[in-house]
Design a protein with these regions (language model features):
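Short terminal or interdomain "cap/linker" segment that borders an active site or interface and mediates
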Residues: 164-187
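Short alpha-helical basic/polar micro-motif
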Residues: 147
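Intrinsic structural disorder
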Residues: 1, 110-113, 151, 170, ...
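Active-site loops and adjacent core secondary-structure elements that bind or stabilize anionic groups
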Residues: 1-140, 144
Length: 187
């Protein structure tokens, strides 16, 4: 699909659509499980999978993305009549490498050639975080899983944008683990 001027889409996913995209490494990190016995991790994972099964019939995840014509003008990004002022990297550098800015990655306005910029947001049904308020452990588990599902939704949406909506990598087939390792080219 060719993107003209702008495209805005809202996507709705089932929990089962997102489960393969959950990064369990960060799930364990949130629970401070690094260095813990494998049995403890497996027990926690079983509890998480059980809760995800509960989520399947009750909740969804959501993504919205937009792809817009854009150009750069010095440190700013221009999207239609909107000017987004941006900062260059601020940290001191020991070598001669440049202080980059997001605008450096777009064609300049002076080129008279439109470029593209994208933006997205993801979320989950709010009940995931608030329906377990009478059980501290389950509430914490729900919040951690909601965070992982929102992140997994971003991974799934990113794949869908690349393969379907923007369509510049329609034949690309990566596993969720390969996507987590950013083995793709481009955005």
């Amino acid at each position: 699909m060719e993107v003209h001027e702008r495209m805005i889409k809202r996507l709705v996913y089932r929990v089962s659509d997102i489960r393969p995209y959950i990064n369990w490494l960060y799930f364990y990190h949130t629970w401070s499980m690094n260095g813990k016995p494998k049995e403890e991790k497996e027990k926690l994972r079983v509890e998480a999978e059980t809760m995800l099964d509960e989520f399947e019939t009750r909740y969804k995840t959501y993504a919205v993305f937009g792809i817009f014509d854009a150009n750069s003008d010095e440190d700013d990004i221009l999207i239609g009549d909107v000017r987004l002022p941006l900062l260059r990297q601020q940290r001191a550098k020991d070598n001669c490498s440049p202080h980059l800015c997001l605008s450096d990655f777009l064609r300049p306005l002076s080129s008279c050639i439109k470029d593209k910029v994208g933006a997205f947001a993801t979320t989950v049904d709010t009940g995931m975080e608030f329906d377990y308020k009478h059980d501290d452990f389950r509430q914490m588990m729900a919040k951690v899983l909601a965070e992982r599902l929102a992140e997994g939704t971003a991974e799934k949406m990113h794949e869908d944008v690349r393969r379907t909506y923007w369509g510049y990598a329609p034949d690309e087939h990566f596993t969720p683990e390969e996507l987590h390792r950013e083995m793709y080219q481009g955005i």
